Amino acid sequence: MTPRLSIIIPVRNDAASLNRTLDYLVGLVGISETEIIVAASGDEEGTKRAVAERARLLWPADSTRAALLNAGAAVAHGQVLFFLHADSFPPANAFELIYHSTSDERVVGGAFEHLFVERQWTLRVITWLNRIRYQFTRNYYGDQGLFVRTSVFHQMRGYKDLQLMEDLDFSQRLKRVGKSILIRTPLLTSGRRFLAHGPWRTLFFVLWLLLLHTLRLDTERYSKRWRGSASRPPGSPWAQGHLHEEAEPPI
């Protein structure tokens, strides 16, 4: 049976988060009508254990997030592509919400409301600021769970091969193709990068990258600082220091 939805998860050295997300996904209503594709780089043994035959596993030659996302989309069979970070948890009725949204022929894709798993007040403020940004601009980040009609994705030729801001660039191009909507139900995502690096320091770094991207200036030179070493998992501190304890995922 052809799946209605293809869930594509890019992952790099993040088997523990991937395992929790897959545990959560397989319990959602409607999962039988979907396919899950994991496009991975880095920790091969840990990633294979995490997947445990619950998803199709790919190992693309290129390890940038854009390359992983495009590789997953290239083998997907669903009518709609749903790009999900390895540390994110869509709402329990996410698939139904996506199907309902795309039943409108004018809608080409969209994203979910953003909310951090962790409850720190600083992250709540950052969430509030971020919501003002994307509700005004309709430019969404990947940690909001971007979704798009498969035909539209191929029409757009997928994600551009960027080291940074590939999700924002895609979202900006998507709304030029057709109606890109915001599903008001929150998708939960880990704030570990903000906690590891310092919430305000990370926020201002993101704003700096956003400014450079908006002005069409180079952001590539900051990619290693943002992504971190290829041998380390996401959310590792930029420098030595205390890594805040993560909240338990909502499963």
Indicate where each model-derived feature is located:
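Conserved donor NDP-sugar-binding/catalytic core segment of glycosyltransferases
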Residues: 92-122
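Short aromatic/hydrophobic "clamp" motif used to bind/position activated sugar donors
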Residues: 81
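Hydrophobic helical membrane-anchoring modules
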Residues: 172-251
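Short, well-formed alpha-helical segments that are part of the catalytic scaffolds
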Residues: 13-27
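Cell-envelope/extracellular polymer assembly enzymes that use nucleotide-activated donors
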Residues: 3-6, 35, 169
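Acidic helix N-cap motif at the loop->helix transition within catalytic regions
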Residues: 16-20, 43-53, 93
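A conserved acidic beta->alpha catalytic loop
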Residues: 24, 39-48, 88-89
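Glycine-rich, basic loop-to-helix element that forms the pyrophosphate-binding segment
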Residues: 60-76
